[in-house]
Every structure is written in structure tokens, then in C-alpha cells.
């Protein structure tokens, strides 16, 4: 997975944390968790606030 795979990343995060409300997650934690995903293989330094926000919004869709 790459940073551009927001939907896939969001689904993985939801599957790992189905009871965690994404609205309570800090971007620093989100970044760390994404980089720790087994299938994630992108450069950790290539993320930015808009990418993390897009992933968080997709995760919120999964959560609700």
C-alpha cells in the first residue's frame, strides 16, 4: 500500500481497531499506525496533513 491508497489503509485501520473512534486519533499516532501496517511499503516521509486527513475521513466512513 502507498499513501495514495486511502481507502485500503482506512479499511485496514478499521479492521485493526473497530471500536476506536477515528475522531479521537492524533495525526502523529495515525502516521505511526499506517507505517506499521503489514502491507504498507511507502516512504514514511512522503505523507502530509492532507493525506492523513483523507485517510482519517475514509476511516470515519468505515467507522460510521
Curated annotation (Swiss-Prot):
Gene3D superfamilies: IscX-like. One of its GO terms (biological process) is iron-sulfur cluster assembly. InterPro entries: ISC_FeS_clus_asmbl_IscsX, IscX-like_sf. Pfam families: Fe-S_assembly. Belongs to the IscX family. This is Protein IscX. GO terms for molecular function: ferrous iron binding. One of its GO terms (cellular component) is cytosol. May function as iron donor in the assembly of iron-sulfur clusters. NCBIfam families: iscX_yfhJ. It comes from Haemophilus influenzae (strain ATCC 51907 / DSM 11121 / KW20 / Rd).
Amino acid at each position: 500500500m502507498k499513501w495514495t491508497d486511502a481507502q485500503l489503509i482506512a479499511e485496514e485501520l478499521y479492521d485493526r481497531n473497530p471500536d476506536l473512534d477515528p475522531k479521537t486519533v492524533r495525526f502523529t499516532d495515525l502516521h505511526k499506525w499506517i507505517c506499521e501496517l503489514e502491507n504498507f511499503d511507502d516512504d514514511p516521509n512522503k505523507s502530509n496533513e492532507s493525506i492523513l486527513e483523507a485517510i482519517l475521513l475514509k476511516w470515519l466512513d468505515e467507522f460510521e
